């Protein structure tokens, strides 16, 4: 499902009084349900996304403590635990990003006051455009810059965050799958993901044609709902992306999947979340009070 055609130049920005395009119905209709494309006002000309300003982050231990990077050829289906051994430092990858085959994630930029101001501005506008009371739902919020070499994949994965990814420099293709498609993401994968394994999501090339495919360029962004599997690739330019995201404070989804994980390990075929409010509430109560394994099965069977 191709969302846009590729363009070599940045799209026209939204009205200057806003960060996002205020007339986009996706914010209100599809927020945290379906991926959608939007426009934004950030490009590489913005002072916070120029390379010297980003490079300053490397001198901030509050941010660099959470930074992650890798380099080398990465196939779409590679698990994060199997990534190539790093032979360059983060600064070396950044300074040689055009040739390093690198991918860098500068996390928790909100610890830098200037980036935190951008994050707050973005989330305030998201609240207004979606009509959602995000502050009451969120556990945490985060700003991230992604920095990628030309012709580089980011492997298929699932995130716990509700995310708005904005392309700032270069071109990038985003492939997002419907989180409710159980051919793409079986219940067992989600159970494992929420219980113990960040690498639980497995890419299945036979279902690639079900992806929402977005061709991102400076001034465009993609909303990625929680649990929506995705993978990315860059083209012939260095790619810079800015992400704003938050995690839900509500643990209901997590606890039901964790309960089902234990049930499946014990040979039970568990009822997926959302099918029975009674079962879901029972599972949440049991997991939240520390029951697991056989105790969980006995409790759910009424023994």
What annotation goes with each model-predicted range?
Residues 2-124, 262-268, 291-303:
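Transition-metal
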Residues 24-26, 91-95, 131-135, 150-156:
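Catalytic micro-motifs at enzyme active sites that drive phosphoryl/nucleotidyl and oxygen chemistry
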Residues 110-145:
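A gly/proline- and charged-residue-enriched helix-loop-helix capping module
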Residues 144-158, 177-181:
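Conserved short histidine dyad/triad with adjacent acidic residue
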Residues 153, 157-163, 189, 209-210:
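A short beta-loop-beta micro-motif enriched in histidine and acidic residues
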Residues 167-223, 228-229:
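Double-stranded beta-helix
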Residues 187, 236-252:
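A short hydrophobic beta-strand segment most commonly corresponding to one strand
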Residues 206-208, 254-289:
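Active-site-adjacent segment of 2-oxoglutarate/Fe(II) JmjC oxygenases
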């Amino acid at each position: 499902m191709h969302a846009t055609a590729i363009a070599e130049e940045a799209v026209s920005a939204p009205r200057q009084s806003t960060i996002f395009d205020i007339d986009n119905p996706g914010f209100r209709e599809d927020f945290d349900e379906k991926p959608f494309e939007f426009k934004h006002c950030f490009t590489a000309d913005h002072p916070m996304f120029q390379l010297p300003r980003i490079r300053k982050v490397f001198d901030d231990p509050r941010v660099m403590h959470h930074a992650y990077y890798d380099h080398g050829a990465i196939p779409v289906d590679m698990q994060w635990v199997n990534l190539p051994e790093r032979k360059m430092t983060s600064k070396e990858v950044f300074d040689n990003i055009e040739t390093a085959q690198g991918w860098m994630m500068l996390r928790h930029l909100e610890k830098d006051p200037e980036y935190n101001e951008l994050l707050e501005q973005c989330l305030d506008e998201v609240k207004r455009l979606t009509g959602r009371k995000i502050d009451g739902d969120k556990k945490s919020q985060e700003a991230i810059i992604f920095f990628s070499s030309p012709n580089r994949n980011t492997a298929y994965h699932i995130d716990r965050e509700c995310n708005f990814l904005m392309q700032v420099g270069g071109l990038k293709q985003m492939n997002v799958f419907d989180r409710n498609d159980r051919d793409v993401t079986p219940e067992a994968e989600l159970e494992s993901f929420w219980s113990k394994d960040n690498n639980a999501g497995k890419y299945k090339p036979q279902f690639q044609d079900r992806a929402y495919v977005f061709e991102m360029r400076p001034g465009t962004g993609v909303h990625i709902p929680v649990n929506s599997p995705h993978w990315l690739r860059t083209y012939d330019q260095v790619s810079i992306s800015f992400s704003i995201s938050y995690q839900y404070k509500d643990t209901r989804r997590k606890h039901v999947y964790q309960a089902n994980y234990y049930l499946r390990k014990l040979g039970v075929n568990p009822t997926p979340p959302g099918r029975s409010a009674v079962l879901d509430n029972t599972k949440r109560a049991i997991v939240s009070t520390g029951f697991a394994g056989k105790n969980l099965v006995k409790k759910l069977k009424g023994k």
